[in-house]
């Protein structure tokens, strides 16, 4: 009986520590999701503003080109649809999100479109991406328990953006800006989806469908 009473404080402390870790994990997930939602909204606004400066024919032509082209981050292996996203583990979704955010660290500093919103927010976007990357890395460390490291991720090395856009021709600047903004919007939507699903899984909610 005495041994049981001695074990009770240890079990209580362990329970409190576990609850504290779970609460901290949820707090980090909430911050990460809120930040990527803000980035996604900013990306959508910048893309819409840039489209508004184009003539209708230009907009249609660029949209056709973009649908046939690829984003630089497409080399990062990620779920192809909602079903695959829901089947992916929390750790896998976090790793993909980390790589996607990482892929925008340099391009976010080199966007030089003639758009007042972008000029005002370029530094802010870079800072938010950097903060989000740190936050996702903390979530990965809290989720992996030594199972997988970032170096073990099967994502390929991203090609440099300079090479990606070097052969765009005379209208390359407009096309480059359009593709960068469209890809940024697309990738922030991906990260928002992945982090939202991962957060839901960690909260043990009954329904995490997209």
Swiss-Prot record:
GO CC annotation terms, alphabetical: extracellular space
InterPro entries given in the database record: 4_helix_cytokine-like_core, Somatotropin, Somatotropin/Prolactin, Somatotropin_CS
Signal peptide limits: 1-22
Covalent S-S links between cysteines: 71-183, 200-208
Pfam families linked: Hormone_1 (PF00103)
Matches recorded under PROSITE patterns: SOMATOTROPIN_1 (PS00266), SOMATOTROPIN_2 (PS00338)
Transmembrane segments: none
GO biological process: animal organ development; calcium ion homeostasis; growth hormone receptor signaling pathway; hyperosmotic salinity response; hypotonic salinity response; magnesium ion homeostasis; photoperiodism; positive regulation of growth
Protein keywords: Disulfide bond, Hormone, Metal-binding, Secreted, Signal, Zinc
Subcellular location: Secreted
Database matches in SUPFAM superfamilies: 4-helical cytokines
Single GO term (MF): growth hormone activity
Binding site for Zn(2+): 38, 192
Chief location bin: secreted
Family classification: Belongs to the somatotropin/prolactin family.
Function: Growth hormone plays an important role in growth control and is involved in the regulation of several anabolic processes. Implicated as an osmoregulatory substance important for seawater adaptation.
Protein name: Somatotropin
Gene designation per UniProt: gh
């Amino acid at each position: 009986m005495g041994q049981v009473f001695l074990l009770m404080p240890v079990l209580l402390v362990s329970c409190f520590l576990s609850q504290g870790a779970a609460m901290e994990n949820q707090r980090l997930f909430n911050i990460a999701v809120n930040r990527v939602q803000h980035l996604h909204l900013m990306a959508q606004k910048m893309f819409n503003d840039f489209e508004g400066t184009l003539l209708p024919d230009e907009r249609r032509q660029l949209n056709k080109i973009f649908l046939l082209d690829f984003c630089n981050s497409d080399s990062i292996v990620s779920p192809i649809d909602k079903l695959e996203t829901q089947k992916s583990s929390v750790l896998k979704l976090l790793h993909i999100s980390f790589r996607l955010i990482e892929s925008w660290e340099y391009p976010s500093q080199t966007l030089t479109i003639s758009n007042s919103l972008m000029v005002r927010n370029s530094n802010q976007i870079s800072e938010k991406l950097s903060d989000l990357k740190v936050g996702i890395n903390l979530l990965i460390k809290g989720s992996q328990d030594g199972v997988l490291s970032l170096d073990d991720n099967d994502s390929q090395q991203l090609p440099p953006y300079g090479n990606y856009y070097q052969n765009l021709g005379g209208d390359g600047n407009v096309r480059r800006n359009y593709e960068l903004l469209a890809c940024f919007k697309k990738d922030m939507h991906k990260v928002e989806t992945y982090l939202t699903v991962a957060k839901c899984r960690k909260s043990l909610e009954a329904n995490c469908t997209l």
